[in-house]
């Protein structure tokens, strides 16, 4: 049975409100997003998280910072992001969180008259060395814990990012998140790549899209074949965040899933 979760939303001002939405909509989990100030790792109350989880029968996944530049050439920046991941791993061990969702930063870019070059692309060897070191440290820190860091597609994986993702996937502690709305908005840049690693696909972000590359829409109101992606997620035993941006849209999306999907 496919397990559905709620994303963190601006209108959910407290953890209690977010858990209440999960309970009211009969969702299985909440994806805690540490981009939000109240969900910064240092702000999280482990006892409260555990108590609410046990009381309401839900679990958590964790969405890491959007700008997760773990291979930045500036060591101070890279160290900060890497430490965030390492701290998230320790929190996940404490709370039994099994999936961490992570973006892959494209990094800074250099604009020429005829094209744009990304520094990670221009200095790919050094970039991949940093990715490899990050992979090894995460593998060591996770150890035999049941935790997977799931790399999410965002604006379309560029070739140097695909190489980095494949390096990460050499470790069993890494997997993939398939964001179907981001894939559509990038012109289907990522689906073939992700499905070529289908055995490592662990997590989905599900939302509909409308023409004009506008995503995070209510399920059933846009152009995506959402049913096909839900079937794939269920086939692979994945979890799925219904990643709308308002509670009302989330409610309508869950109604659509239970009625039409």
Q: Which stretches of residues belong to each language-model region?
A:
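N-terminal pre-domain/capping segments
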Residues: 1-87, 93-95
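Active-site acidic/histidine proton-transfer and metal-coordination neighborhood
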Residues: 54-55, 74-175
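Active-site beta-loop-alpha junctions enriched in small/polar residues
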Residues: 7-11, 33-37, 65-69, 105-107, ...
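Histidine-acidic metal/acid-base catalytic patches
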Residues: 2, 12, 16-23, 71, ...
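Hydrophobic "anchor" residues on beta-strands that sit immediately upstream
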Residues: 27, 59, 148, 175, ...
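Catalytic-core regions built around general acid/base machinery
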Residues: 44-57, 126, 130-141, 193, ...
